[in-house]
Amino acid sequence: MKLIILAAGYATRLYPLTLNQPKPLLPVAGKPMVDHVLASLGAIDAIDEAFIVTNEKFAGHFEAWAGRRDSSGFAPPVRVVNDHSTGDDNKLGAIGDLHLVLKTQGIDDDVIVVAGDNL
């Protein structure tokens, strides 16, 4: 089973807090919000891989996070998928991003889809 985390929004309603930081990486109780999301799903043994789909603006932020994340709450590998959107005018939207991950990663398995900013 695969986990897909939707995190390609621009969080403009939270500016200036999210001007240079994606909302799922904002700290909540001392760790990024997305770490809480992953920890809440860590008990599902069937999940063997996770994908975070994001945009061009924040892809580097998520790559850096993925390289140093604490995997104690969620052991499977987490891969970052860049949808290459650069703003609200060319973003793919949730369904478009989901389709992108399914196709580009060759996923032919059950999936769980969650938002990266829901606790």
Residue ranges and their predicted role:
Residues 2-5, 13, 27, 31-115:
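Conserved N-terminal catalytic core of the sugar/cofactor nucleotidyltransferase
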Residues 19-23:
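Short alpha-helical oligomerization interface
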Residues 118-119:
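A short, conserved beta-strand element in the Rossmann-like catalytic core
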